[in-house]
Amino acid sequence: MKFTALPFEVGPVHFVGIGGIGMSGIAEVMLNLGYKVQGSDIKANPNVERLTGLGATVAIGHKAANVDGAGAIVVSSAIKPDNPELVAARAAKIPVVRRAEMLAELMRLKFAVAVGGTHGKTTTTSLVAVLMDAAGVDPTVINGGIISAYGSNAKVGLGDWMAVEADESDGSFLKLRSTVAIVTNIDPEHMEHYGTFDVLRQAFFQFVENLPFYGFAVLCTDHPEVQSLASRVEDRRVITYGQNPQADARLENLKMDPSGATFDVRFRLRGQDETVWRDIFLPMMGEHNVLNAVAALATARELGLTEAGAKTALGQFGGVKRRFTRTGEWKGAAIIDDYGHHPVEIAAVLKAARQAATGKVIAVMQPHRYSRLHDLFDDFSTCFNDADSVLVTPVYTAGEDPIEGADQAHLVESLRSHGHRDAGATTRDAVAADVAKRAGEGDVVVCLGAGDITLWAYALPGELEALG
């Protein structure tokens, strides 16, 4: 089975915002398949540099002239209707393709595993990819994060399968037609698009219902919303996973130490003999990451993965950039960068940090979007219980206007009123000094957020050293 349906004659494909983590993966796959790819972004970044090295032409800044000669332009939901390139393309009658539509076009030509869920998609997609490799499947991969084993968020494989991250944020994941659908969890998020939690629930149900009759869903029944979803699926095969005693792939005997997790998985699938894969090691912290690994194991086992192959692949798993990534240390304190920006994610990451630390856990948290902070304010006020100290930065606006009561000062005040003993405000200039007052041997400092706090996390070890 080969990529043949999308004609090369379509002309240069122009990606607006080509450096974004979602767009860059599709662009990289298309480049490696031989398509002519160009694009633009507001600034250069490692994704832009990687794509340029592969042959893409990338303009810095958005200008109408950038789309001259393009055969089609690809946009994500982050691109506003008044973007000059989008306006120019429509005026010139150049086809405009949504990101998910282009991803669906690539998926249409392969069997595909699509990983959905409010949290854990990127790590789970990465784990699925490396386990599919271990099963000899050689998948094409398009992910929402940099997979350490690939040095990229994408790769073209020679096999018949794909592993992709299915982004539910704007509902466009329903355009994807996969063979396998994984759902890790379902929490209230992206309400600016869905309006109500019931609409989001229905979207995930439709995501599973879109499977062909020969496909299957892999659903985490440790999560009440996903367990409810599983009960509604009547016409498609379902494999459940989790610590739930009723799960088809049950996590057992989980043990954690600072090097990672060791665990067993008991498989009890209809029509198969019960089997147990024992003493699997995953060099990642956190129960949430182990559950992601169980989802990947349950999926790849259906594609031919053996127990020995699973142990080798997971034991060598290098992780995903911005998922509990160590950026350095200072006086025995580890500095961690993590993408967690939703209260559920933050709580899971801090629980993992608590397991890794022999001392204190210090959270440096950059709220991402006023709307998210506003909609989930009470949850943000109570998700830092595993942190001894919380330093809150100004909100990363992502282009949003301020919302009354949803800002740095109000969050700090709310954390204190909810009983947190050491919650305070910090800034880019003050963060090193604020951390230095608190951090020491055996501590873990976790920089959390989906904005530019990742730059803070990588600069922090050097800035702390400069303080002495």
Curated annotation (Swiss-Prot):
Pfam families membership: Mur_ligase, Mur_ligase_C, Mur_ligase_M
InterPro entries: Mur-like_cat_sf, Mur_ligase_C, Mur_ligase_C_dom_sf, Mur_ligase_cen, Mur_ligase_N, MurCDEF_pg_biosynth, UDP-N-AcMur_Ala_ligase_MurC
Cellular compartment(s): Cytoplasm
Binding positions for ATP per the UniProt entry: 117-123
Catalysed transformations (reactions): UDP-N-acetyl-alpha-D-muramate + L-alanine + ATP = UDP-N-acetyl-alpha-D-muramoyl-L-alanine + ADP + phosphate + H(+)
Alphabetically ordered keywords of this record: ATP-binding, Cell cycle, Cell division, Cell shape, Cell wall biogenesis/degradation, Cytoplasm, Ligase, Nucleotide-binding, Peptidoglycan synthesis
One of the GO biological process terms: regulation of cell shape
EC class (word): ligase
Cellular component GO terms held in the UniProt record: cytoplasm
EC number: 6.3.2.8
Coiled coil start-end: none
GO molecular-function term, one example from the UniProt record: ATP binding
Gene3D superfamilies xref list: Mur ligase, C-terminal domain (3.90.190.20), Mur-like, catalytic domain (3.40.1190.10), NAD(P)-binding Rossmann-like Domain (3.40.50.720)
Main location: cytoplasm
Keyword Oxidoreductase annotated: no
UniProt keyword Zinc-finger, yes or no: no
UniProt pathway: Cell wall biogenesis; peptidoglycan biosynthesis
Protein's job: Cell wall formation.
Annotated family: Belongs to the MurCDEF family.
HAMAP family per UniProt: MurC (MF_00046)
Name of the molecule in the record: UDP-N-acetylmuramate--L-alanine ligase
Biological source species: Maricaulis maris (strain MCS10) (Caulobacter maris)
Organism ancestry: Bacteria, Pseudomonadati, Pseudomonadota, Alphaproteobacteria, Maricaulales
Gene transcribed to yield this protein: murC
